[in-house]
Amino acid sequence: MTPLRILISNDDGVFADGIRTLAAAAAAAGHQVTVVCPDQERSATGHGLTLQTPIRAERADELFEPGIKAWACSGTPADCMKLALFELLPEKPDLVLSGINHGPNLGTDVFCSGTVAAAMEGTLEGLPAMAVSSACFQWREFQAAAHLAIQVAEAALADQWPENLLLNLNVPPCKQEAMGKLSWTRLSIRRYDEQFSPRVDPRGRTYYWLAGEAVEDFESGGDGPRDWPTDVAQIQADAPSLTPIQPELFWRGGLSSLPQLNIDQ
């Protein structure tokens, strides 16, 4: 296909293996690649923006394959995408990719994900965008995920990519030859046993570390093909999950399902 202008970001930071592998795969496929990503770990920052301090961006070409332009930005993933689209890039890209995240972005976890937020910022600006995640924090072999991400993006662009559609790709932690077949999936609803670990600093003040373990995964009750598996079930079957997401979160269950508000005004 015609070479694409691809903008890549992430939330794991400029030194993460995932983003470097994805950028290298995109460049190897003949595309023009620009990276604008956080200068440090920014996981679980959601769609947060930096408003009270300045944002700095420094060139980081030396961390990537020759020919890839890169900036390391002091802000959040959403900051990086805004700065790239409205200041750093001379023209809008054809495609936005975010990742490869070092860990899954499944179900309702997408609301916390900086990886998904960076892609969503592209979607909000009317650009085709995809978030890519390796569904295991310990897995460090990103080549299969990068190859699949480029294949999916190229195929979608060659056919149709509806406006306001974000694609969320999660890839299981296994070799490509052991991987199941890619499938469209639905978002699951994830529930956590939130665990706060209290500590005391040298001045006697209490602080907390947040940890949590997913204890339940529910099928969403929203609209969509009911024969699609959930993204969590797909990954548990060692198969890649591709979930279409849209930024418009309006309730679609109908007026009869909403509470009756007998309020005097």
UniProtKB/Swiss-Prot annotation:
Catalysed reactions listed for this entry: a ribonucleoside 5'-phosphate + H2O = a ribonucleoside + phosphate
Q: What is its EC number?
A: 3.1.3.5
By its UniProt entry, which Gene3D superfamilies does this protein fall under? Survival protein SurE-like phosphatase/nucleotidase
Q: Where in the cell is it found?
A: Cytoplasm
UniProt binding sites for a divalent metal cation: 11-12, 43, 101
Spell out the SUPFAM superfamilies in the cross-references.
SurE-like
InterPro entries linked to this entry: SurE, SurE-like_Pase/nucleotidase, SurE-like_sf
Principal location listed in the UniProt entry: cytoplasm
List, separated by semicolons, the cofactors it needs. a divalent metal cation
| Class of this enzyme | hydrolase
Provide a Gene Ontology MF annotation, just one. Answer: exopolyphosphatase activity
Instruction: State the UniProt keywords alphabetically.
Output: Cytoplasm, Hydrolase, Metal-binding, Nucleotide-binding
Domain of life of the native organism:
Bacteria
Pfam families, A to Z: SurE
Q: Does the keyword Protease apply?
A: no
- Give the coiled coil ranges: none
- How the cofactor binds, per note? Binds 1 divalent metal cation per subunit.
Under the cellular component aspect of Gene Ontology, which terms does the record hold?
cytoplasm
Similarity comment text for this entry:
Belongs to the SurE nucleotidase family.
What functional role does this protein have? Answer: Nucleotidase that shows phosphatase activity on nucleoside 5'-monophosphates.
Write the protein's name.
Answer: 5'-nucleotidase SurE
Q: Which organism is it from?
A: Synechococcus sp. (strain CC9311)
Q: Which gene encodes it?
A: surE
